[in-house]
Amino acid sequence: MHVDDFSFDLPEALIAHHPPEQRRDSRLLCLDRDTGAVADRRFPDLVDLLRPEDLLVLNDTRVIPARLFGHKPTGGRVEVLVERPLDRHRVLARLRASKVPAPGTVLTLEGGVAAEVTGREGEFFTLRFTAEQTVLELLEHHGHMPLPPYIRRADVAADRERYQTVFARRPGAVAAPTAGLHFDNELLARIGARGVDTAWVTLHVGSGTFAPLRVSDPREHRMHSEWLDVPPATCAAIERARGRGGRVVAVGTTVVRALETAAQDGAVQPYQGETDIFIYPGHRFHAVDALVTNFHLPGSTLLMLVSAFAGRERVLAAYRHAVAQRYRFFSYGDAMFIAAGAADE
């Protein structure tokens, strides 16, 4: 296996830098995971592709405005990207500056916020904010939405809403679970009216989701760690769905990683803690029967996960079809629905 096995040609013009006017305006490419057959649909058609006995599992993480700009005591500019809060006043963060600040350096950030560099852990730094407000309160007031690096523009006020799912509840992610961005409340209501149950997991997406592989053999790659919670109620909902012959439909690769982490012994069990699970071709799936997902970067771990689910050649053929049909790619782009028989329903 080589990372180049997961490459494809993508014209720059197909990278979506802005969301569609309405969440549901996205297109939906349906892929049969068994045969490779594809069909072009619209995202609201997902209602008809789901069956009353199915279970839709969504990630309720909430993106925090994790990016801050400021300067060092020397006047040099610095950018802070919070990876995760450690407590009420400390964070783990990436720093971008012409020269890395040493421990003890006090950074002056937007709004006059002061943060002291207290240590370094590999590619991350620990920062302590000196204000009385909590880290999350400071970020809500002064932070910027952490748009992905391939969206080459500054964040705007609308991103506070659109780079966030309508069901986001638990703050902690620094990247959106983007498959969930296509759902609005009306679409969720229609899915519920069809008889489809909904369940929740939390996986706080880290900035490592955008990190390129630095090895040629993906099996040598070490995944970043992310916090997740698969509650007992979700495990019970999965058992009920399976009992009535329904499918477990994961909305996004984050849900797949959460459920497969919780099902490493076969059945999905309650789980709360860290995961660094890396799913690539050869993985045996225990928890997921169908997948709603966006289009992913060439050579990325997320494309490898989708390839594990539906087969590398079938997925890459579907991507070539998507390019030819000018689908929009990545976080603000279009979506796929992958399941057995998905192109025929």
Curated annotation (Swiss-Prot):
It is found in: Cytoplasm. SUPFAM superfamilies: QueA-like. One of its GO terms (cellular component) is cytoplasm. It catalyses: 7-aminomethyl-7-carbaguanosine(34) in tRNA + S-adenosyl-L-methionine = epoxyqueuosine(34) in tRNA + adenine + L-methionine + 2 H(+). Its EC number is 2.4.99.17. Keywords: Cytoplasm, Queuosine biosynthesis, S-adenosyl-L-methionine, Transferase. InterPro entries: QueA, QueA_dom1, QueA_dom2, QueA_sf. One of its GO terms (biological process) is queuosine biosynthetic process. Pfam families: Queuosine_synth (PF02547). Pathway: tRNA modification; tRNA-queuosine biosynthesis. Monomer. Transfers and isomerizes the ribose moiety from AdoMet to the 7-aminomethyl group of 7-deazaguanine (preQ1-tRNA) to give epoxyqueuosine (oQ-tRNA). Belongs to the QueA family. PANTHER family: S-ADENOSYLMETHIONINE:TRNA RIBOSYLTRANSFERASE-ISOMERASE. NCBIfam families: PRK00147.1 (NF001140), queA (TIGR00113). This is S-adenosylmethionine:tRNA ribosyltransferase-isomerase. It comes from Alkalilimnicola ehrlichii (strain ATCC BAA-1101 / DSM 17681 / MLHE-1). The gene is queA.
